[in-house]
């Protein structure tokens, strides 16, 4: 059988269908959308952006570069005390300490030895009093200053034993710590107390020239009022 009749028949069918479809489109142009029956045209321009879609789920953190280190923050409040630590290791044995009791006893012993030496060399002790002299002569004020320098006072006998010790130690005239320079005729010691023990020489005190306000012990142990500016031996009295 020849193929040409079949090709003619197929072409006729296609042309008939195209014609029929064109007529149908013309009939319904006023009542329906136009359907292009021709081959596709060129693509048009892009349309406007549509509305934003719904928010998507949170994505994974990106791997950006590490930023610069920030400035140090302010000092925070002081925290609560911590738990006490464990005891430390035992230290090395220290040197032996000095017993204050022994040191004080040794010091007292040395002072006693010095006192004995002073008494033997140039002093006299009677009861709780120690009398010392340097053998120099000076005014009453000079004697007071000398004795005060050594935290002592001018020798002041309160009984015959003390009076004799001062007499023997001085060996010559010496000032006593007695005066009436504040009230004439009222002899007091250097603390202002009125003296009870007295050993005046005959006719004394006589306040010659109304200016004898100090007291000296004579070689025989008797007392005599004398000028305070006189130069006599210095005898100081220390507590023993």
From Swiss-Prot:
<dbReference type="GO" id="GO:0050766">
    <property type="term" value="P:positive regulation of phagocytosis"/>
</dbReference>
<keyword id="KW-0175">Coiled coil</keyword>
<keyword id="KW-0677">Repeat</keyword>
<dbReference type="GO" id="GO:0005537">
    <property type="term" value="F:D-mannose binding"/>
</dbReference>
<feature type="region of interest" description="Disordered">
    <location>
        <begin position="48"/>
        <end position="102"/>
    </location>
</feature>
<keyword id="KW-0379">Hydroxylation</keyword>
<feature type="modified residue" description="Hydroxyproline">
    <location>
        <position position="81"/>
    </location>
</feature>
<keyword id="KW-0430">Lectin</keyword>
<dbReference type="GO" id="GO:0006958">
    <property type="term" value="P:complement activation, classical pathway"/>
</dbReference>
<feature type="domain" description="C-type lectin">
    <location>
        <begin position="126"/>
        <end position="237"/>
    </location>
</feature>
<feature type="disulfide bond">
    <location>
        <begin position="147"/>
        <end position="236"/>
    </location>
</feature>
<feature type="modified residue" description="Hydroxyproline">
    <location>
        <position position="72"/>
    </location>
</feature>
<comment type="subunit">
    <text>Interacts with MASP1 and MASP2. Interacts with MEP1A and MEP1B and may inhibit their catalytic activity. Forms oligomeric complexes of 2 or 3 homotrimers.</text>
</comment>
<keyword id="KW-0106">Calcium</keyword>
<dbReference type="GO" id="GO:0043129">
    <property type="term" value="P:surfactant homeostasis"/>
</dbReference>
<dbReference type="GO" id="GO:0005771">
    <property type="term" value="C:multivesicular body"/>
</dbReference>
<feature type="domain" description="Collagen-like 2">
    <location>
        <begin position="67"/>
        <end position="97"/>
    </location>
</feature>
<dbReference type="GO" id="GO:0005615">
    <property type="term" value="C:extracellular space"/>
</dbReference>
<dbReference type="InterPro" id="IPR018378">
    <property type="entry name" value="C-type_lectin_CS"/>
</dbReference>
<dbReference type="Pfam" id="PF00059">
    <property type="entry name" value="Lectin_C"/>
</dbReference>
<keyword id="KW-0732">Signal</keyword>
<dbReference type="InterPro" id="IPR001304">
    <property type="entry name" value="C-type_lectin-like"/>
</dbReference>
<protein>
    <recommendedName>
        <fullName>Mannose-binding protein C</fullName>
    </recommendedName>
</protein>
<feature type="signal peptide">
    <location>
        <begin position="1"/>
        <end position="18"/>
    </location>
</feature>
<dbReference type="GO" id="GO:0001867">
    <property type="term" value="P:complement activation, lectin pathway"/>
</dbReference>
<keyword id="KW-0176">Collagen</keyword>
<comment type="function">
    <text>Calcium-dependent lectin involved in innate immune defense. Binds mannose, fucose and N-acetylglucosamine on different microorganisms and activates the lectin complement pathway. Binds to late apoptotic cells, as well as to apoptotic blebs and to necrotic cells, but not to early apoptotic cells, facilitating their uptake by macrophages. According to some authors, it only binds mannose.</text>
</comment>
<feature type="modified residue" description="Hydroxyproline">
    <location>
        <position position="46"/>
    </location>
</feature>
<dbReference type="InterPro" id="IPR016187">
    <property type="entry name" value="CTDL_fold"/>
</dbReference>
<dbReference type="Pfam" id="PF01391">
    <property type="entry name" value="Collagen"/>
</dbReference>
<dbReference type="GO" id="GO:0005581">
    <property type="term" value="C:collagen trimer"/>
</dbReference>
<dbReference type="InterPro" id="IPR051077">
    <property type="entry name" value="Ca-dependent_lectin"/>
</dbReference>
<keyword id="KW-0465">Mannose-binding</keyword>
<feature type="compositionally biased region" description="Basic and acidic residues">
    <location>
        <begin position="49"/>
        <end position="60"/>
    </location>
</feature>
<dbReference type="InterPro" id="IPR008160">
    <property type="entry name" value="Collagen"/>
</dbReference>
<feature type="modified residue" description="Hydroxyproline">
    <location>
        <position position="87"/>
    </location>
</feature>
<dbReference type="InterPro" id="IPR016186">
    <property type="entry name" value="C-type_lectin-like/link_sf"/>
</dbReference>
<keyword id="KW-0180">Complement pathway</keyword>
<keyword id="KW-1018">Complement activation lectin pathway</keyword>
<keyword id="KW-0391">Immunity</keyword>
<feature type="coiled-coil region">
    <location>
        <begin position="104"/>
        <end position="122"/>
    </location>
</feature>
<keyword id="KW-0964">Secreted</keyword>
């Amino acid at each position: 059988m020849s193929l040409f009749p079949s090709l003619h028949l197929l072409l006729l069918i296609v042309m008939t269908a195209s014609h029929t479809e064109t007529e149908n489109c013309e009939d319904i142009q006023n009542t329906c959308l136009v359907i292009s029956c021709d081959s596709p045209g060129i693509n048009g321009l892009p349309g406007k952006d549509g509305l934003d879609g719904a928010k998507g789920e949170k994505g994974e953190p990106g791997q950006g570069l590490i930023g610069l280190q920030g400035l140090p923050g302010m000092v925070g409040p002081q925290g609560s005390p911590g738990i006490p630590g464990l005891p430390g290791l035992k230290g090395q044995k220290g040197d032996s300490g000095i017993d204050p009791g022994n040191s004080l006893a040794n010091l007292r012993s040395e002072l006693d030895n010095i006192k004995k030496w002073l008494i033997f060399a140039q002093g006299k002790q009677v009861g709780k009093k120690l009398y010392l002299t340097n053998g120099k002569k000076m005014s009453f004020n000079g004697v007071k200053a000398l004795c005060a320098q050594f935290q002592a006072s001018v020798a002041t006998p309160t009984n015959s034993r003390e009076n004799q010790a001062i007499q023997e130690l001085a060996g010559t005239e010496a000032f006593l710590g007695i005066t009436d320079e504040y009230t004439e005729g009222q002899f007091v010691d250097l603390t202002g107390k009125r003296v009870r023990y007295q050993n005046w020489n005959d006719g004394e005190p006589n306040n010659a020239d109304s200016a004898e306000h100090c007291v000296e012990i004579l070689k025989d142990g008797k007392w005599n009022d004398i000028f305070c500016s006189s130069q006599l031996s210095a005898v100081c009295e220390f507590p023993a």
